Amino acid sequence: MNYLTQTLVCTCALLTLGMFTAPSRAENTALPPWQTLEFEQKALWATAKSRIELVAAPQHPGQWLLSANSSVVSNSEEVHLRLLATSGQLVSRSRLSRGKNQRLKTYHYRPQYILRERRAPGPDPGQAAALWPLQSTKEVAYPDDLGAKVLTDAYALLLLAQRFGDTQTNSHQVAVHTDLNFYQVSLSRGQDTAIEVNYQLAGQGQVDGTRKARVIKLKVTALGQARDKADFRLLGLNGDIELLFDIESGLLLQLRGTAPRIGSSRISLKSATLREST
């Protein structure tokens, strides 16, 4: 693929918003009823926790800010996304990882390529991560097979799967960018099921009992040639994943999939904060 063709294809991918067929544009830009979700998974040797928050981008009309904090044992990550509200298309992304080493990676999604910047701590231990010395910059090419697919982040799949579930569409595909790799995620419908829940709803108390859930399946495959080891994760899960949404409230109640070193796993909603009415 020559440079001009690649530019046109990638520009098309950024501008064609990959909208689902049923919801209107106004519905696609409405924030979901929740503002924060917190999940937890307990294993014999560790407890994994994740917190997701979604708000409108105050200085960027038509865009959302998604923040995610996940931790297990001594490792943690802090992810910030700026997304197009209509599609979930990435505008910018950052990931601060802490563990044996610390590093901050930021990504700017341009029509021709992704600008990737990597920072690491300097001599000042109190320096903010955004001010850490720049270690490297890299232009990451979009894969030839991206086409007009929406390019998003794994955490944003929680939003897109909920939106997909509210349509009459039977299947949908998006692309996910990790660091150097790209993945195709195919969304489809599973059989509705009943699920036992036990979570805290801020300001309203404990919610427990049996809920009817809509099942959305995610099938993850490599998109283009792998440039690094496999690194797709969604709240610690990889491979094929199922998301279970409360049919009545729309809240994501549980994720089911495979976790490294653990095997088959279920990650359940532990608390939720609903958005204030405006």
What is the predicted role of each segment?
Residues 22-26:
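Sec/Tat signal peptide C-region and signal peptidase I cleavage site
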Residues 1-11:
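Bacterial N-terminal signal peptides that target proteins for export
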Residues 20-21, 31, 56, 131, ...:
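Selective for proline/serine-rich intrinsically disordered segments
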Residues 9-19:
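Bacterial N-terminal signal peptides
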Residues 137-182:
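Extracytoplasmic beta-rich ectodomain segments of secreted or membrane-anchored proteins
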Residues 27-113, 166-278:
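Acidic, serine/threonine-rich low-complexity disordered tracts
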Residues 89-145:
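Hydrophobic alpha-helical segments and helix pairs
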